[in-house]
Amino acid sequence: MNPAIVVVGSLNMDFVVTVDCLPAPGETVLGRGFQMIPGGKGANQACAAAKLGGPAGSVRMAGRVGYDLFADHLKASLSAAGVDVTAIHATRAQPTGVALIWVDRRGQNSIVVASGANHELLPVDVAALRPIFRGARFVLFQLETPLDTVARALEAAREEGARTVLDPAPAQPLPKELLARVDVLTPNESEACRLLGRPVERLSPEEAPALAGELRNLGPETIVLKLGEHGCYCLSAALEKFVPGFPVEVRDTTAAGDTFNAALTVALAEGRLLEDALRFANAAAAISVTRLGAQASVPGRSEVEEFLRSRMLS
């Protein structure tokens, strides 16, 4: 049986240091704690989709790792969450990817990624993914693997009848031909600015509709502009609306975007209406920022449903 959701993307081991404030260039600061946590945008989203979705095997991840202990740990973590890891293969060309993450007391972070084996997921590998895409409802992508591979895989997923979701992170300009193969594009503010060739800046919610309109003109069917604590703005043929976020006490924002993307994809794969899917995604992301870490911060489905019920009653 083919999975309902396929995630094509990165796997990294995250080295997380908590600090009082993020270091300035040339500055040394003392950390308050250290953790080694499974991560990578692709792996985070696959883990989140499995925890938020249906039965084991309904989510499969495709990616590359090295021949090392980090690879074993990452695959075991995904398997424990219910992700099918049979399309994650090892390469001797590079070690498993790693990310160095600093998190301050406000929950804000800075991240440096050494991609390693993630760069070995090549366009030639996409042919082997076609049978996995066939029958899947959605294929979810990010940009921590080679751009040529993402472009080829987007095309293949569409040709095999799946709908596509692209989280355009890390932020970078993208060719219009690639964006035309995206059904749902989910940038945050800085990623939206980079896609449009603008200086990266903090945007007011009032600017979201115009920005989303410009992004939709690039080709994607649906734009979901993530606005942090403000929630998100959606522009599609069926919906033009702000969907507000949920105020919570923020501890760590590391995997908020990954949780949002996974939750949105799960809800859409289940056939939920777009506005309901966005509310589900906002709730899942809100819970995740109250916890430290990437995959460890992702809530289960029952937690999100209970969170939504409690907010409707309050």
Language-model segments: residues:
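Conserved phosphate-binding/catalytic region of the ribokinase-like
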Residues: 1-5, 173-177, 205-314
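Conserved beta-alpha-beta core of the PfkB/ribokinase-like small-molecule kinase fold
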Residues: 125-129, 136-210, 230-232
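A glycine-rich helix N-cap at a beta->alpha junction
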Residues: 77-93
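Conserved phosphate-binding/catalytic loop of the ribokinase/pfkB sugar-kinase fold
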Residues: 86-91, 101-138, 143
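Glycine-rich phosphate/adenosyl-contacting loop at the front of the ribokinase-like
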Residues: 1-64, 69-80, 249-251
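Short beta-strand scaffold segments in enzyme catalytic cores
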Residues: 47, 98-102, 110-111, 231-235
